[in-house]
Amino acid sequence: MQQQTINIRAAKKSDAVIIARAVAMAIGDENALKNYCGENYITLLKQIAESEKSQYSYLNALIAETNNTPIGAAIGYDGAKLHELRATTYSIIYDTLGRTPSIPDETEGGEFYIDSIAVLPEYRGMGIGKQLITAIRDKALSDGHARVGLIVDFDNPRAEQLYTSLGFTRVGTRTFFGHKMWHMQYII
């Protein structure tokens, strides 16, 4: 594939589909999404991304694009706002499915949390994920956050190595969707 120019920008409402795809890829378990949300889980995640007050809102996202085509996204927010953002997210899920999931808190106050990051498969291995992480981390720091956190599966040492190369360090563990995760932070 020819070297392409990558642009990182703030998301727009019209980016809801790539945000939905990024969230689904970050969750990583398509079967669980289908079992819980049905075949149209991307449509539900898109609706959540279009909301201004949800966890996965376009207002909380940065987009990687090439030739004006979105190819990846990073979603992050102030951990202190998790319950407020999750309430909107759960409301949309309930309105669609008649039930809400039970998800443990993966962040807390005092931390800007990188919730989801993903790049379309055909664009992986080109440093785009690294650009997205750096951009959302730097945005959080410029917005006044002293800590930027994320979680990474114990079974994903490549991702952990990437985060470590960007200055993130292990600060604890979390269990999320039955998976053991490292809680990592970048601290000023």
Regions found by a protein language model. Give the residues of each.
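Active-site rim helix/loop that mediates acceptor-substrate recognition in acyltransferases
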Residues: 39-61, 66-67
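C-terminal "cap" of GNAT-fold acetyltransferases
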Residues: 146-160, 165-167, 173-188
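Conserved acetyl-CoA-binding loop-helix of GNAT-fold acetyltransferases
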Residues: 125-142, 161-165
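Conserved GNAT-fold acetyl-CoA-binding loop/helix
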Residues: 27-49, 86, 94-96
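Conserved GNAT acetyl-CoA-binding A-motif
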Residues: 110-112, 124, 140-151
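Conserved beta-strand in the GNAT
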Residues: 63, 69-78, 113, 118
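Conserved acyl-donor/pantetheine-binding loop and adjacent beta-alpha core of acyl/acetyltransferases
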Residues: 80-112, 116
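A short beta-loop-alpha structural element at the N-terminal edge
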Residues: 7-21, 32-33
